[in-house]
């Protein structure tokens, strides 16, 4: 079975924005009032974007928090599908239609 590629983590998009605006992780963290490690972990795809972070990023970049959360939810669902799909197909049987 061929290994599927993981979807893009929202940290990748955040890194692109930071590059576009010439921001360091430290500068962005300071600007939005979080610890630099939080930004570093998001960019490294080791941390999810929480509602708190989404609100801060949206305010700073002039975007909306829902978009940040949608990107994160999409990523999480794709990862879950790739890692759990066969187990769920094996363990969960569809409900039978009423006669």
What positions do the PLM features span?
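Residue-level detection of the helix-turn-helix DNA-binding "recognition helix"
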Residues: 33, 44-46, 73
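Short, charged recognition helix plus adjacent turn
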Residues: 69-99
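The alpha-helix within a helix-turn-helix
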Residues: 18, 29, 58
């Amino acid at each position: 079975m061929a290994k599927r590629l993981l979807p893009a983590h929202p940290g990748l998009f955040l890194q692109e924005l930071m590059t576009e605006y010439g921001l360091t992780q430290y500068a962005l963290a300071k600007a939005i009032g979080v610890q630099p490690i939080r930004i570093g972990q998001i960019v490294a795809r080791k941390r999810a974007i929480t509602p708190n972070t989404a609100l801060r990023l949206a305010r700073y970049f002039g975007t909306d928090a829902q978009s940040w959360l949608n990107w994160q939810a999409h990523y999480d669902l794709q990862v879950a599908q790739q890692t759990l799909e066969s187990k769920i197909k094996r363990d969960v049987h569809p409900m039978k239609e009423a006669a």
